[in-house]
């Protein structure tokens, strides 16, 4: 697989391999903020309500690219250990592909079903989140802030970001919360919906916002911000939809309402609305970047489902045991932020 972007990001390892990690090109002289990095890693860590019981230390081990806590200009190579592996959980179903998981297409492509999802596992979002934390540091010095919240879990919805007036203070406050929602009531109801799961799973939607991008950042065609952001968002397991601004609501709009009018207020160019989500023609327009990422319900559930036995080629049933997230959107939030941060940093690097 080719590395991603100007930073040549590459993620290696699997869900049940001894190690996993990443390599990426990082400018020389970045003093790594360990507190920031560990905070972002903790936000995707298991242990929260609705997440897998799998426990890993998730401590970054620096192989190269760092001297005395500062990047030295060499390729940054960071790895993590996989210690809490239970491959035996998959032995009973090794010929039964889990519905809507990677199992069947991976079996056809590679000749086997990868243990724990292999390279298709959400475990690989750990190095992605680490890379995003490094990007957050670099972008912070450029005045860029990124934050997010759970917009929807099951049938419970949170208040949306104000598309024109979301502040960096609000984004910072959300990042400090263990269960980031704008409305306290939404947090309570979402947690109740997750706690009520009995062997099933829930889908969810994360809303992200980025502030401080200079007007014109991005480009045309596949060099545009939407293209870059989407390509990384869809690298996150379970993501099935990515929307910008009004997103699918554009289908019911007239242009007279969809267009974001411009005004001069106090000598400053402003917008009357932000249906474009801060991006026009692949370039930042100065308004907040608003992105919504929808996650499917976790495919691995304990309820009986229809499948097939690949050995006997007969119909079969499967109830998945093992340790799985009840709602992958919960830990997917940190991965989504990382993807947005990396895509924005990549746009800056393209123009350097």
Model region roles, listed by residue range:
Residues 2-352:
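Generic N-terminal targeting/processing segments that precede catalytic cores or assembly contacts
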